[in-house]
Regions:
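Long, C-terminal-biased catalytic regions of enzyme "large/alpha" subunits
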Residues: 1-182
Length: 182
């Protein structure tokens, strides 16, 4: 927030930018997947509260909806799934409940955030570079500090340091031998 304040954003704008990146951490007000829609699918207040309490620590909303967080009894006895189904590695509670990929993605962005500032409401495109990171951030992120920029940063700092300098240089996942040679 101090960087956003220095750039001239007001408190409401800062809150929206942060919520876009970090999410709400709650099902309250969430599109598609919320206490009302979950109750309509058989969720109890107790289970909804349990899910909601786990949300601030998950990176994806689906992590809060599994046999470990919901319990096998609830999944089998209340929701009607079978044991083999819930033990499958690719079991997706939200999809099985009828939520579409688009609905789950939208709910995920609301609850867990986009994990990037790119596309945040109010944030000026001219300010994106201030927040660039070593890698692309989130599913929607496209920006990152180029590998050569890491080397240039070290070169700029080296004259002011006595001794060695060490820096991890992050390369994109699709980097090959030719990229390193260049």
């Amino acid at each position: 927030p101090p960087a956003l304040e220095k750039l001239g954003y007001n408190k409401d704008q800062i809150s929206e930018i942060i919520r876009y990146a970090k999410g709400s951490g709650s099902l309250d007000g969430c599109p598609y997947i919320n206490p009302q829609s979950l109750k309509a699918k058989g969720f109890t207040d107790e289970i909804i509260e349990k899910v909601d309490k786990s949300l601030p620590s998950v990176f994806d909303i689906t992590f809060a909806f599994n046999k470990f967080s919901l319990g096998t009894d609830f999944l089998i006895k209340t929701l009607g799934f079978d044991k083999d189904e819930i033990n499958s590695y690719d079991f997706d509670v939200l999809s099985k409940l009828g939520f579409s990929k688009t609905e789950i993605s939208s709910a995920n962005d609301y609850v867990c955030g986009t994990m990037t500032i790119e596309g945040a409401p109010f944030l000026k495109h001219d300010h994106y570079s201030i927040f660039d990171c070593a890698n692309k951030c989130g599913k929607k992120g496209t920006r990152f500090i180029r590998p050569l920029a890491h080397i240039k940063m070290m070169a700029s700092a080296q004259p002011f340091i006595s001794g060695a300098i060490s820096k991890t240089i992050n390369l994109p996942g699709n980097a090959g031998v030719e990229d390193i040679k260049d």
